[in-house]
């Protein structure tokens, strides 16, 4: 007598099969090779971090997107990373600690506790490159050009590039500084995520 085990993946979780898996792997290598050619150095951050410090300055936003659980070994709360960019910032600030310009790149899995408004999947592969210690306009242009090159290598057409500035956001938020802390934080997050529905709830 045999029994059939019925199984399914969690909502928003995908797996890659042939030939798609090979296509994704080849693209990952192609992107990293492009970054290496521009003198970016590879880092491999851990997929797990302490919940109390994950995300650094963006802690609240990053943690709100992370799966968290208690570590059976230490009893501390751990989180699965939902983003690698903030990990790169942490590595530059606390591990490398260089006074020189630092250029890092990475590729790895990220897991989010909920799907975004853009992507159905909660598990994705994030590939990126970051420049630290160089506030010049040349560094900004290098980052933008590298991003556009990455999009080109990915075979994505009809791209729209939105460029923001922290000073502009601060100017927009200035009239709402009298809101209580919770409402102001919600407004700031809605602007960051470009969520019209959330904005309408706060600003009729």
Sequence positions of predicted segments:
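Extended, charged alpha-beta segments that form solvent-exposed binding/catalytic grooves
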Residues: 2-204
């Amino acid at each position: 007598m045999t029994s059939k085990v019925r199984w399914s993946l969690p909502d928003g979780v995908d797996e890659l099969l042939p030939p798609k898996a090979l296509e994704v792997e080849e693209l990952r290598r192609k992107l990293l090779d492009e970054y290496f050619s521009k003198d970016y150095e590879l880092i491999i951050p851990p997929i797990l971090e302490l919940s109390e410090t994950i995300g650094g300055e963006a802690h609240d936003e990053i943690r709100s997107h992370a799966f968290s659980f208690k570590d059976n070994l230490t009893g501390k709360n751990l989180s699965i990373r939902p983003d690698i960019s903030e990990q790169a910032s942490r590595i530059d600030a606390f591990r490398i600690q260089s006074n020189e310009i630092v250029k890092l790149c990475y590729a790895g899995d990220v897991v989010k506790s909920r799907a975004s408004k853009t992507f159905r999947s909660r598990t994705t592969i994030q590939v990126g490159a970051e420049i630290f210690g160089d506030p010049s306009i040349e560094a900004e242009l290098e980052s933008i050009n590298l991003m556009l090159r990455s999009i080109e290598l990915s075979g994505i057409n009809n791209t729209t590039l939105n460029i923001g500035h922290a000073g502009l956001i601060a100017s927009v938020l200035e009239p709402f500084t009298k809101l209580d802390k919770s409402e102001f934080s919600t407004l700031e997050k809605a602007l960051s995520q470009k969520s019209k529905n959330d904005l309408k709830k706060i600003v009729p």
